[in-house]
Amino acid sequence: MKLCLLLLLLCLCHLGLTEEPSPGAPDVSDSVDEEEDTVHGCRGGQVFSREEHRVIGGAIERLGLQLLENLPIGPKQPNVILSPLSLAFALAQLTLGARNETEKLLLKSLHAHGVPCYHHILGSLVPHFSKTSLDVATRMYLRPGFDVKLSFVEDSLARYRSQPVPLVSVEEVNQWVENVTNGHIPNFLESIPHDVVLMLMNAVYFKGEWKTRFDPQVTSKGAFYLDSQNSVSVDMMKSVHYPLRLLDDPELEAQVASFPFKGNTSFLIVLPLPGKENVSSVLPKLNISDLYRRLPQEKTMQVNLPKVKLQYRQELQEALTSMGLGSLFSGPDLSGISDQPLRVTGVRHASTVELSEEGVEASATTVVTSMRSVSLFSVTSPFIFALVDDASLAPLFMGIVTNPAPDNDPMLNDGPLGNSTMSDQPTTDSDRERDINSKQSSKTESAECSSMASCSAPFGEREQPHSLNELEGGNGQKKTEDRSCSKPDDSVPA
């Protein structure tokens, strides 16, 4: 099962009651830049092609990657979970009321320049997602007495289904949040500042099921390597025969795997190779839609995947300022919303993510003629993930996991490891093949030791057997054992 939910809150307040609106501020009806093709340039109810949806999906991806690069990661905040889709909806709705340089700035941040009918295509994704396991809820809270332009309210409702509701109390807001997130985000707000006159809220909820589930009885404790010195104990989901699309990308120096979900969505994992890149250096080179298109056909392989249950809360003002949107928080032109001067006072974000074994069907029982043909994908080190809509290739959620069990105390590693991936994570198909062969042999301790990450010798210097026959010297005689090794923690019974 995959459970993701996110709430994005964008607050607007008065710049000051003593200030007057800019003279000659354009009315919403004549503020449309036809070259940018905002809401009034296209027909309502228009049907868009998959290619047009994928153009928007690419724009959402670039927005998400840019935000990921600007969010802090460290010991106190080791993981990041966000929804580029949710942020795109919030900023796009704000764009409906932005004018002049503020409108251009927002369109640039949304990567919407030169995209015809941007608002219409983005808004058309909402009913599209109703066919998947994704629910999108939006709401516009208005302070009673605040003079908002009717055109902004109507456009927000038409394009993004954002219902206008009176801003009465923090309790009412928190109750809505709790309801749309199925109780996962209670008490979202402590209070509402008196000068807040408008709140744009967006909630994205996804509860999906693996197309092929993991067997809970096989889940066992394993090591997740935080870095070359430290690891943490996690519950590791395992399968010997799991259908997966796996790509070894030499340019990224990473493995890319796609796990199918029910309902036309996929869970993409980008795992840096041992001793090569780390997640921070991979991000600037990442192109999720390109990777998605280059993934090979699905094949059966051995998989180790940590169970994850994480929560994430973050104010996005600093990250958005780093992305060039700092003027939103000082003196933007939002005269399409109201003639009263406004500014954005906060963008608050909360999310959770859970990975567990549940799925729609049992693990595939495809007959594997030889274990030598089975590859291994073992997620035992920091990784990047994305939940991708298969049709539009829009990343519904994205994140970085550097510690899937932040509440557990870290442990010192037994020996030298790569800087980003446990050393029994093979870097090529042949390495994975040798790793599988060694782990399948229970006849000798030397077979168990041959693929160990915790051996005292460096990974590149350890001898890797090519077959069970080689382990026994080709004539049934056991080779000399290396008793400095012990049985690997993540071995999976066939």
Protein language model regions, located:
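Detector for small/aliphatic-rich hydrophobic stretches
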Residues: 2-166, 359-360, 407, 414-415, ...
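Non-catalytic, conformational "gating/processing" segments within enzyme and secreted inhibitor domains
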Residues: 24-28, 77-78, 93, 116-278, ...
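Extracytoplasmic/secreted cell-surface and envelope-processing proteins
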Residues: 102-104, 277-279, 312-314, 394-398, ...
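Short Gly/aromatic-enriched secondary-structure transition segments
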Residues: 106-110, 214-221, 280-289
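Extended hydrophobic
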Residues: 200, 250-270, 370-415
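Intrinsically disordered, low-complexity segments
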Residues: 282, 455-458, 471-474
